[in-house]
Amino acid sequence: MEFKNQVYGIIAEVCQDDVVKENPEIAIFDEGLLDSFGTVELLMAIESQLGITVPITEFDRDVWDTPNHIAEQLAEMK
């Protein structure tokens, strides 16, 4: 659970909204919390804070659509 909380914290920082911590199933793109520039910022933050490199080609909005799904994808990449 600690890893997920770390991921949620990074997403909240990039989105500038703690709602992602409170509701990890929120659709961050549909709700306007993250856009294409935010996506790049998120991937850079993930790499710098978690040491996980996510190629932009691996980032599919339909798969990486909620904080929970992002945490699950990153856990598989660790």
Swiss-Prot record:
GO terms for cellular component: cytoplasm. Residues 1-78 form the Carrier domain. The keyword Phosphoprotein applies. Keywords: Cell wall biogenesis/degradation, Cytoplasm, Phosphopantetheine, Phosphoprotein. One of its GO terms (biological process) is cell wall organization. It holds the Pfam family PP-binding. 4'-phosphopantetheine is transferred from CoA to a specific serine of apo-DCP. GO terms for molecular function: D-alanyl carrier activity. It is found in: Cytoplasm. SUPFAM superfamilies: ACP-like. The modification O-(pantetheine 4'-phosphoryl)serine is found at S36. Its main location: cytoplasm. Gene3D superfamilies: ACP-like. Pathway: Cell wall biogenesis; lipoteichoic acid biosynthesis. The keyword Chloroplast does not apply. Belongs to the DltC family. Carrier protein involved in the D-alanylation of lipoteichoic acid (LTA). The loading of thioester-linked D-alanine onto DltC is catalyzed by D-alanine--D-alanyl carrier protein ligase DltA. The DltC-carried D-alanyl group is further transferred to cell membrane phosphatidylglycerol (PG) by forming an ester bond, probably catalyzed by DltD. D-alanylation of LTA plays an important role in modulating the properties of the cell wall in Gram-positive bacteria, influencing the net charge of the cell wall. This is D-alanyl carrier protein. It comes from Bacillus pumilus (strain SAFR-032). The lineage of its organism: Bacteria, Bacillati, Bacillota, Bacilli, Bacillales.
